[in-house]
Swiss-Prot record:
GO terms for cellular component: cytoplasm. This is tRNA-specific 2-thiouridylase MnmA 1. GO terms for molecular function: ATP binding; tRNA binding; tRNA-uridine 2-sulfurtransferase activity. It holds the Pfam family tRNA_Me_trans. It comes from Clostridium botulinum (strain Loch Maree / Type A3). Disulfide bonds join C103-C199. It comes from the Bacteria.
Amino acid sequence: MKKKVLVGMSGGVDSSVAAYLLKEQGYEVIGVTMQIWQDDEEFIEKEGGCCSLSAVADARRVANKIGIPFYVMNFKDAFKRNVIDYFVDEYMEGRTPNPCITCNKFIKFSSFLDKAMAMGIDYVATGHYAIIEKHNDRYIIKKSEDDKKDQTYALYNLTQFQLERTLMPCGQYKKSKIREIAKEIGLRVHNKKDSEEICFIPDNDHGRYIKNRFPNKVREGNFVDKQGNVLGRHKGIVYYTIGQRKGLGIAFGKPMYVVDINPFRNEVVLGDLEDLLNTELIAKDINYIPFDTLKEPMEVEAKIRYSQTPSKAIITPIEDGRVRVNFQEKQRAITKGQSVVFYKDDLLIGGGIIEK
C-alpha cells in the first residue's frame, strides 16, 4: 500500500517541486496550504509572500497540474499564539526573535504533523533545503546539496519523533535544478521569486507592525551611551535591533550602533563598532539532533545568524541545560533572542536561543 504524505505548499517553487518529486517516488501525495493570516489583517499581496491569498491560488494550480488533491487548513489560532504573540513579546523585552524558526517548531513540524497523524497520514513534507538521513538508530540532518540555499539553520529544533515522519526531497538538489524541474513539468511558479521577508510582515517593518497592533505598548524613550548619558530620543525599543546603524533618526558625526536594549528603562544603548564584537555567548532552550545531551565540551562550527558562514567554536554544557559558546574569532552583533546553531562539517549538531 502506498505511504501517504501531507505536503505543506506555500505556492512557491520549492514546495511545488517537493510535491511532484514525492509523487514520482510513489507516495500518495496530498497538498495543503496552511492558513495563518489573521482576519483583522489586510494581508498584503506580494509576489513571493508565503501563505497569502495569492499563494493559495498558486498552490492550488500546481496541485491540479501534478494531479494531487489540495486543501487549505486553518492554523490561524496556533500561529497567532505561538508565532505572532511570541514575536511581539520578544521585541517588547528588547530581544530579536526569529519567527521562521518558531513557526517550524510549533506549526510546520508540530501542529501540521499532528493534523497529518490524526488523518492517518504517514509523513509530512516541505520544500526545505536539508537532508534527513537515518544513521544507526537516530535520524540526523545534513546540509543540503545547495550550500547557498541550505536551510538547516532553521531546523535545529526538530525532534527524533518529527524527523522520523518528515520528508524534504529538495535537499538533494541545487536550487537551479529545482527551477529546471518546475519548468520541465510546466509549472508557472518555476520563476517565482523566493520570499525573503517575514510572511506576516511583507514590508519587513517590524516596528511599525507592532506599533499598529499594540499602540499602547510602544513608547518613546532615550538613546543613551554606555555611561547612561542621554544622546537623544528613540521612537520605541521595538524599532531597533543589536548592530543596527541605519534608521536611528539622529546624526552623531561618527557611526553609532545599537549595542544594547534595556526594556526596563525603555532605553536603547548606542556605542562604537568595537562594542559589538564578542567571542562568547550563553544559549538556552538547546536541542541536539545526533544525540540527546552534551556531556563535555565539543569543537563545532557555529553561526549566530541565518546568512553567516559558520565559525570555529567550542560549546560547553553549563547549568540548567544551557550552553556556553566560545568562538575562536570575534563575532559581530551577537543578538539576544536569535538562534545560535552548531555544525560538524555538513552535520547539524543542534542549536539554541541566545540568552546573553
